[in-house]
C-alpha cells in the first residue's frame, strides 16, 4: 500500500469514528443497558459494507484506495466490535445476563442480516 492508501484509510477511519461517536452521544444514554448508538453504528455499518462489497465487486477497475477509504477506513471506524464487547462484558459483570444475550443477538445477528441485505440491495439496483 502506497502513501495514498494510508491517507485513504486514515481519512475514512476518522470520518467513521466521528459518526460512531455522534451516534453514541445522541443515543447511548437512552438505555445504558442497551446503548442504542453502538447498535446503530454496527447495524448501519453491516448494511453499508454489504452495499460496498457489491459495489466494489462490480467496479473492480476503481483504484484500490477507494475500497480502503470506504471499507477499511470509514466502515472500520464506524463499526464498534471493541465497544460492543466491553458493553456485553459490563452487562455480564452487572449480572444483566438477559441484556448481554440481547446485545449478542442484536449486534451479531442484526449485522449479519443487514450485511446480506446490503449486498442484496446493491445487486437488485445494479
UniProtKB/Swiss-Prot annotation:
User: Which superkingdom is the protein from?
Assistant: Bacteria
Location, primary (coarse class):
membrane
Which Gene Ontology cellular-component terms appear in the entry? plasma membrane
Q: Which amino acid positions bind Na(+), per UniProt?
A: 76, 79
Biological process terms in GO annotation: cellular detoxification of fluoride
Q: Which GO terms describe its molecular function?
A: fluoride channel activity; metal ion binding
Note one Pfam family from the annotation.
CRCB
Protein name, per record? Fluoride-specific ion channel FluC
